[in-house]
Amino acid sequence: MRESGILMPVSSLPGPYGIGCFGKAAFQFVDFLSAAGQTIWQLLPLSPTGYGDSPYQSCSAFAGNPYFVDLETLEKEGLLTAADLKAESWGKDPLEVDYGTLYVSRFAVLRKAYAAWRSQCAGLHGCAYYYPDDYYAFTLANEDWLDDYALYMALKAANKMKNWVEWDAPYRRRDKAALAAFAAENEEEIGFWKFVQYKFSVQWQAVKAYANEKGVQILGDIPIYVSADSVDAWVGGKLFELDADGRFARVAGCPPDYFSADGQLWGNPLYDWAYHKKTGYAWWVRRVRHALGIYDLLRIDHFRGFDTYWAIPATSTTARTGKWENGPGMELFDALEAALGKPPIIAEDLGELFPSVRKLLADSTFPGMKVLQFAFGGGDNEYLPHNHVKNGVVYPGTHDNTTLTDWWENGASQKEKATAAAYLHLTSCKPTAKEVAAVKTAAARTALLRAALGSVADRAIIPMYDWLGLGAEAHLNTPGKLGGNWAWRAKAGFDSKALAAQIEAECVVYCRCNADVQNVK
């Protein structure tokens, strides 16, 4: 079945408290998607943001982002007051996330909510604290990661949020006696981090259930790597190329490509794939199983890294000096299927692709991705719509691309614009520079959107900012740039009935709306 969806980060939803969250705006956006005939809501990772405010550099592969907990829901539960919310600063610009301000204000308010929650639970049933049954169910169901995560975050708080490799040796090396003593002395702090994850889970599951009731699937995102400063690296040990003190000789990244002339030096620890194989890829099975409890569909970032990955000396200042190493290949995906059934994975197969990567994608039968902003460099480019395949997902651009408006006005070369203009019937087949210059941005954007929707690919995902026609102000991420990313927020009222009707009309033409809408139209 042909489908279409919208890429819209939770962080980009409007609201009064500095960042999008699981409150009214999330439910309203689901209503908007349904009204527009869309069947997919694609998200960025819901994990806590880390270095550079990136959701791809998280302190946990399993935890949720505390910033997404809806504060107004906590207020309704009696855990916060209006005065609590007014007492904090939430940033100067409602259209941009101020992560520095948010770090201070959000956690201050969440700690007030936790204190109120503990007060509500104090002395119940003759216990010092008796928490709700669903809290105990949540902690039990997630104990394989939650206990370590909460302990890790409490230790970070006690160590002024330093990287775990800078902690004292007993904690860095996970000495059992030292950790047990710390946990006993910091029970309340550890409980805070569990409380936040509990509220995250309850609120997110309500949003997801509502979306599913409306016929909208949630497409989540799994970064291939974990952060060096993460509970996963601290606990993982033999899963990664680390010694007991967290030192590593090589780190992850990717070679020079369209996005960066120096490549991308991510700095993540590399997996010890030989050890993963010995365990039957148990950690990856746990990770994907957990993700399938949060999302309906999974986009796995940097799919090519499962075939061959770029290993960079830790002392390098750019990614140019790396070398290719072999990944686990189909063995990993066979293990996932044996444990979980065929996982609903979409492979992010962008970048330099060896024939072996293409074979892995074919063997896995996962749909890959096509990005129109890469299509117009000349020749019979694989990203041109006539080269798309049915088992695929087409995008005008991803979160790493700029918006269509900014691409046409500032990003595309003259050759790309001329090629695109001719291909999209905006000019003659061999346009002059004057013809290309006469093409209006709005016309180019509409033509590119329709090219995506008209693709033979089963799924088309359009970023929300491209439906809105926004420019560089909505560019989510510039790879290789530290700071100033992941900040865009939509204006209140962006998800209007008029825009929903426009999107529905466009998608009906290309038979991409949900079945109810398509059959009526």
Language-model regions, residue ranges each:
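Outer-envelope exported proteins of Gram-negative bacteria
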Residues: L44, Q217-L219, P223, L297, ...
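Mature N-terminal, pre-catalytic/accessory segment of carbohydrate-active enzymes
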Residues: M1-G37
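Surface-exposed amphipathic alpha-helices with a cationic face
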Residues: S34, W204-N212, E337, L361-A362
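Alpha-amylase-like alpha-glycosidases and glucanotransferases acting on alpha-linked glucans and related
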Residues: P9, G18, D53-Q197, V226-I461, ...
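Structured C-terminal cap/extension of enzyme domains
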Residues: G469-N519
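Conserved, well-ordered alpha-helix/loop/beta-strand core segments that scaffold catalytic motifs
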Residues: W193-V226
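Catalytic domains of carbohydrate-active enzymes, especially glycoside hydrolases
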Residues: K24-T49, I294-Y295, A452
